[in-house]
Design a protein with these regions (language model features):
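GST-like domain detector, emphasizing the conserved glutathione-binding G-site
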Residues: 1-116
Length: 118
């Protein structure tokens, strides 16, 4: 069974929701309310010591970070593959994913965090 620890306002979580939908996988969802600082709850920090969302738990093992979660899902459930087989195309996909994670997501994260403290 899959359990996804989420926060719906998180753009990183949205990426994982899309991957799960593309794979047609069912999962349990656990809301981690960042507005209420639930990411710092000791129980959640046992699952993800960095205190971020999303985190996927599968077979008792936690996978943090949205891009890693998406790759894990694609490799674990190979039906309807999302990652190309061709090494060059795979490297381009990872390059784009890294660009999004390090620029777009980082910018939206900073904006979101600034709104939390208003």
């Amino acid at each position: 069974m899959l359990t996804l620890y989420t926060f719906h306002n998180s753009i990183c979580t949205q990426k994982v929701f899309i991957t799960l939908a593309e794979k047609d996988l069912s999962y349990d969802e656990e809301l981690v309310n960042l507005f209420a600082a639930e990411q710092y709850d000791p129980e959640y920090l046992k699952i993800n010591p960095k205190g971020v969302v999303p985190t996927l738990v599968h077979k008792g093992r936690a996978i943090p970070e949205s891009s890693l979660i998406c790759e894990y899902i694609d490799e674990t459930w190979p039906n309807n593959a999302l990652i190309p087989d061709d090494p060059f195309l795979k490297s381009r996909m990872r390059q784009f994913s890294k660009l999004v994670d390090e620029t777009i997501f980082e910018a939206t994260r900073e904006l979101s965090l600034s709104l939390i403290h208003i």
